[in-house]
Every structure is written in structure tokens, then in C-alpha cells.
Amino acid sequence: MRAWVVPMRFRVSWMLAGCCAAVVLAGCGSSSGPDVLTAPIQVVRTTDGTVGYRELGSGPPLLLIVGGGDSMDDWPPSFVDALAAHHKVVVFDNAGIGRTSAVSAPGSLSITAMARQTSALISALRLRHPAVLGWSMGGMIAQALAVTHPAQVSRLILAATAPGTGKAVPLPAYTFSVFSLSSKKQAASLFPKNQAAAAGAFLSAVGHYQSYYGPSAATIHSQKHAVLQWMAGHDAAGRLAGEIRVPTLVAGGTADHFIATANDRLLASSVPGAKLILFDDAGHAFWFQDAAKFIRVVETFIG
């Protein structure tokens, strides 16, 4: 395993006036191309309940799995649109959020159960071997998916997440208390303290969704249980990272307030052949601080 460290500083200019990352190099002002803000929320019945999702773009499929405490409306539109320029992108709500069915009784949710529902979504939408990008808790779900349903995944991008081998550096005690803070403070927690502009731009970006919503307090509590069980090594799928055979990219920020950089390294060393890339001076939402650069990394990796 070799780690690449990418110097990174936030560039707020590409977010101004609603410019999307897809046109950073070409210049702002283009109204053509995929637009997640106009993609309707759809509901599909799966073998594991209903799932609310959006899809846009065309090309090889790319499934985005959002983190804990988030809905699919926590993916900034510019980020999704940029990926959809070359892919059929699917974003969706995890179990118990929005129009997605719960998959367990309160307090007994597991990462593997959410991966099972994600697998059911892939089957219901007839996605052919999608690349899967999971952020934070979504990266844990992506790992479990690759372990339990390897034939469904072509490539794995694990962003700001942790292994489930039982060796992970624990989350800080304040992690789940963040969800009780104001939206402004929640956004700030995703970035280093010297990146206030990034936090403001993130909050502005997700504010473009007309009917923004998030999970209930009960769902967040269930997710907390699932994440802590995973990181402690109590979820069977998490202990099988060594069996992941799909090409895997692990990425993280060196200034992440939640997921220690040591976890990025541990995860990359646990998955055979995994590549590791670290973004310098970047927080939990490193993929947003310099979206254009991260998207180029993703596009190169997916091929």
C-alpha cells in the first residue's frame, strides 16, 4: 500500500453563482447537462422495503451512499452534477429516512442490514455492476456491500470512513452530539477551522434543494448503534475486509475531526490492493473542499 498526499486548499469561486464543478475548467454559466435539482425523488419497491432515490446522467452507473445523519439531499448539487456528466448517478436515502423503509427495530440497526437494502436497490434498479462511492457511514455500508454482494460492485471508493475489523481508532466523544447543533455549526464541523468559506459554501449548496429533509432523532440513534458496532468489530461483514476483491480506493482528509487519518491507513491496509490518497488540510468533507480535484481522482480510478 502506498499513500499519496494531495495538497489542497478550498476554492470558493467555483461555487459562486451556482456554478457546478463539472464546468470548473470550462467556465461558469452553462445551463446544459445533468441537474440533480430537477431530478424527481422516485420510490422503488425492493425485496427489502421501499427506497427513495434520484437518478440522473448517463453512462456507467455510479451509486453514492451518504453518511450518518444525512439524507440524499446532503450531497451538494454541484458535486452530483459533475459526476453525472459521465455517469448514471444514483443517490438514495438510507434505511428509515425519507421514503426509505426501516429495516430493523429501533436500536438494532446494523451496517450489514443497510448494505442488504442497498443491494436490493441495485437489483430493483437493474444497475449493472455499479461503481460505489460511500462517504463516512456510507463507506462502511459500501464495504459491507462489497463483502456480502461482491458481484454487484465494480469499483469501490471509500471516503472518510473506517474499517470494521475491530482495530479502528474510535470516534471522538462529541461525534453524534453534532447533530443537535445548528445547521451552520454542523457544516463547520465538516471542515478545518481555517476553512470557514468551505463550510459556508457547503451549507449554501445543500440549501438549493427545495424540500430539504433529514433523519429523525430515532434514526440517528439507530445509526449510532450501527456505526459503533461496526467500528468495534461486532459486525461480521466488517471483519471480512480482507475478502474484498474489487478494486478499491480509500480517500480521506488529514484534518478530519471525526475519522482519524489512522483509520484511512488501517482500512487501506486491510483491503487487498487498495489505493490510498490523503488530502492535506482537508476535513470530513474533503471531497467538497476541492471537488474538481477529487472528481478527477474518481474518474481516473473508475476508468
Identify the function of each model-found stretch.
Residues 49, 54-101:
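Conserved HGGG/HGGXW glycine-rich cap/lid loop of the alpha/beta-hydrolase fold
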Residues 91, 96-131:
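Active-site loop/oxyanion-hole signature of alpha/beta-hydrolase fold enzymes
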Residues 139-150, 156:
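Short glycine-enriched nucleophile-adjacent loop
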Residues 147, 156-184:
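Flexible "cap/lid" loop of the alpha/beta hydrolase fold
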Residues 212-237:
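Hydrophobic, aromatic-rich cap/lid helix
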Residues 244, 250-252:
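Short beta-strand/loop motif that positions the catalytic acidic residue
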Residues 257-263:
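Conserved alpha/beta-hydrolase "acid-adjacent" motif
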Residues 273-303:
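Catalytic active-site module of serine/aspartate enzymes centered on a nucleophile-bearing elbow/loop
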